[in-house]
């Protein structure tokens, strides 16, 4: 039977999706299922790994039924996933020994403080390209081994397996036959040396994590194994692509050349710039990470993570009840005319790149009796664009590359006002693609390259198409005046303390 589709499994923080893509890279079907969030203590976020698997199985079944697709028409499966989230399970039973600790969770911050006080920061930075932070997987694994009775000893005996979500999905889909991850996910664990491309003995010793529990690290595009027959009506389908969500979006945006960059505007913002075969060490508060490993070659990226972006609009809607639906924010922002000197620094969980300050709170500046709801909404929407400029400034400083255009994706980029303001404040064109689902598309492309569904990156690059191009049209004096106000607001926010 002719292979007509590639299936992407996009396992996210709040939901799992299964998506079919045809040879033109267009969406041919989608199914989505949300799952529960677990908050055992303030600042802790966990998931039930079994519930994640159930959501994935359900979306696959729904997709095949709704699209009336024969499993034999699927060339391969690409997996993309919420990064850093850590699962530890029993190899014999396949049962998790604890919940998955989610990337957002701050429950390992005390471990991070101890590691910093012990003087490990520079070593971690040099080997992994990361900072010591509760965000990354390494301290999460250590926490589980520290807090589950007998876990570390069992791990040393080879009885337990660790994996990021991609590893967990593949283990289950293959019936426990395959324990792998790819370069992109390994590079987010704080245990992987991104230069030597191996699990690092010094990092493992620092965290007291036994090497026996770690997955094999493979390329981002190859056949890792076959699914068990029960998931695809008696058929086996090759699992052939893996990438963490942000790297998958970079690939889905066809940012294949050094200096090309994308920004994903979701709950937070994640901006990645391709730096080719150079692992550029950041001096400006960014992360150095692996973009992907394909064709026997690893390529790198600089990454800036902004913790609060689209979620500020959700907060205005749900917390302050300023409007009924998120899309209303565009009309409110446009009605305001300008920001009237109001700046909103949405540091609800601190500030991410390039500041990395988890100890500060959000703030609003410049309020007068004349400040309206519209000004407030506009300032909140503008904050996404200002934070992106902070990251881009750091990227250009680190890489020595001046950005020619920014490829944008994610829910918030549907807001035309935000997209235009972003272009204005960066003084760079912002391109919104025709296919908005770039994360799932990137995973599909990686799988399709491995199975021969697509022939090359050149073929993929030709498929990438612009929905709308936003050109900068703000006078330079006004642009710099607005950005200077933002910088003052950030500085004031960082100086504010609650005793």
UniProtKB/Swiss-Prot annotation:
Inhibited by fructose 1,6-bisphosphate (FBP). GO terms for biological process: glycerol catabolic process; glycerol metabolic process; glycerol-3-phosphate metabolic process. ADP binds at residues 13, 17, 267, 310, 411, 415. One of its GO terms (molecular function) is ATP binding. Transmembrane segments: none annotated. CDD domains: FGGY_EcGK_like. Pfam families: FGGY_C, FGGY_N. Keywords: ATP-binding, Glycerol metabolism, Kinase, Nucleotide-binding, Transferase. SUPFAM superfamilies: Actin-like ATPase domain. Disulfide bonds: none annotated. Glycerol binds at residues 83-84, 135, 245-246. It catalyses: glycerol + ATP = sn-glycerol 3-phosphate + ADP + H(+). ATP binds at residues 13-15, 267, 310, 314, 411. Key enzyme in the regulation of glycerol uptake and metabolism. Catalyzes the phosphorylation of glycerol to yield sn-glycerol 3-phosphate. HAMAP family: Glycerol_kin. This is Glycerol kinase. The gene is glpK.
């Amino acid at each position: 039977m002719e292979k007509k589709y590639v299936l992407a499994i996009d396992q996210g923080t709040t939901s799992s999706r299964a998506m079919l893509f045809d040879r033109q890279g267009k969406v041919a079907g989608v199914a989505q299922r949300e799952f529960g969030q677990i908050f055992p203590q303030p600042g802790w976020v966990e998931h039930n790994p079994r519930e994640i698997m159930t959501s994935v199985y359900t979306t696959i079944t729904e997709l095949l039924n709704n699209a009336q697709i024969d499993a034999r028409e699927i060339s391969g499966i690409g997996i993309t996933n919420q990064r850093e989230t850590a699962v530890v399970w029993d190899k014999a039973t396949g049962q998790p020994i604890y919940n998955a600790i989610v990337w957002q969770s701050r429950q390992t911050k005390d471990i991070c403080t101890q590691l910093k006080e012990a003087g490990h920061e520079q070593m971690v930075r040099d080997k992994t390209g990361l900072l010591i932070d509760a965000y990354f997987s390494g301290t999460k694994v250590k926490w589980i081994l520290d807090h589950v009775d007998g876990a570390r000893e069992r791990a040393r005996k080879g009885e337990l397996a660790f994996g990021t979500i991609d590893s967990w999905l593949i283990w289950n889909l293959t019936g426990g036959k395959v324990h792998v991850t790819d370069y992109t996910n390994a590079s987010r664990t704080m245990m992987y040396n991104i230069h030597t491309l191996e699990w690092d003995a010094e990092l493992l010793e620092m965290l007291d994590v036994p090497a026996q529990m770690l997955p094999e690290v493979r390329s981002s595009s190859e056949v890792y194994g076959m699914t068990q027959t029960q998931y695809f009506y008696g058929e086996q389908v090759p699992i052939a692509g893996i990438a963490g969500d942000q790297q998958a979006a970079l690939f889905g945006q066809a940012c294949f050349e050094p200096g090309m960059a994308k920004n994903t505007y979701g709950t937070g913002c994640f901006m990645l710039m391709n730096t080719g075969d150079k692992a550029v060490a950041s001096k400006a508060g960014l992360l150095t990470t692996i973009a992907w490993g394909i064709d026997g070659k690893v390529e790198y990226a600089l990454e800036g993570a902004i913790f609060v972006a689209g979620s500020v609009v959700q907060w205005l809607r749900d917390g302050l009840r300023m409007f009924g639906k998120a899309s209303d924010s565009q009309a409110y922002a446009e009605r305001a005319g300008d920001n009237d000197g109001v700046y909103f620094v949405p540091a609800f969980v601190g500030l991410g790149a390039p500041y990395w300050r988890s100890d500060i709170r959000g703030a609003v500046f410049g309020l007068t009796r004349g400040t309206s709801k519209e000004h407030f909404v506009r300032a909140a929407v503008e904050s996404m664009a200002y934070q992106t400029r902070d990251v881009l400034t750091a990227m250009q400083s680190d890489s020595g590359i001046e950005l020619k255009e920014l490829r944008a994706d994610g829910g918030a980029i549907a807001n035309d006002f935000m997209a235009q303001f972003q272009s204005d404040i960066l003084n760079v064109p912002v391109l919104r693609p025709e296919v908005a689902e770039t994360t799932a598309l990137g995973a599909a492309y990686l799988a399709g390259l491995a199975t021969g569904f697509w022939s090359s990156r050149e073929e993929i690059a030709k498929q990438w198409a612009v929905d709308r191009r936003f050109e900068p049209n703000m006078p330079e004096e006004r642009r710099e005046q607005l950005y200077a106000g933002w910088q003052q607001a950030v500085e004031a926010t960082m100086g504010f303390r609650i005793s």
